[in-house]
Amino acid sequence: MLYATGVRIGELVNIKINDINRYDRTIKILGKGRKERVVVYGSYCEEALNVYLKNGRIELNKKKCDYLFLNKDGGRLSDRYIRKIIDDVVVKCELDYHISPHTLRHTFATDMLNNGADLMTVKELLGHSSINTTGIYTHVSNEQLKKVYAFAHPRSKG
């Protein structure tokens, strides 16, 4: 869900069941400065969410907790434990580089921009108050530059 939505880890652990609109595939997020925004998620995230809600969460929800992600005792999952889960996956997959929750957020933003999203939309999805903050993610690959040039410049053909 971190990569699917681009949310911060602190936002992820504070998502409550009622924040999710499964019909629209949206999640209400309470971000930095207690600003509310809506993020969108796709079909892959929906499938994983369905499996978690139907299987894992039901077994974990011993305390009738409102939070989406629960620990083994039925309370809210901590950001520290999510970091541990990510670290464990990196080790299991034998990756030779570090991945953090922020890496997934950064990759979300970069992939959105590289696949045609405009900067203002990405700014809103990330919950940035300034476009300058979002500008960090605008490092564009040479392939992306060539692709956009070929598509958009009237004299690129030939």
Predicted regions and their residues:
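Short, charged phosphate-coordinating catalytic segments
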Residues: 2-24
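C-terminal catalytic core of tyrosine-transesterase DNA break-rejoin enzymes
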Residues: 4, 88, 105-128, 136
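Flexible coil/turn residues that form the inter-helical turn or adjacent wing/linker of helix-turn-helix
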Residues: 5, 75, 97, 115
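Short coil/turn motifs that cap or connect alpha-helices
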Residues: 8, 16-18, 118, 129-132
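Short functional hotspots where side chains directly engage DNA or cofactors
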Residues: 25-30, 100, 111, 123-141, ...
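C-terminal catalytic core of Y-nucleophile DNA break-rejoin enzymes
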Residues: 31-51, 65-85
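DNA/chromatin major-groove-contacting recognition/catalytic segments
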Residues: 44, 51, 140-158
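Conserved hydrophobic residues forming the short capping helix/wall of the S-adenosyl-L-methionine
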Residues: 53, 90
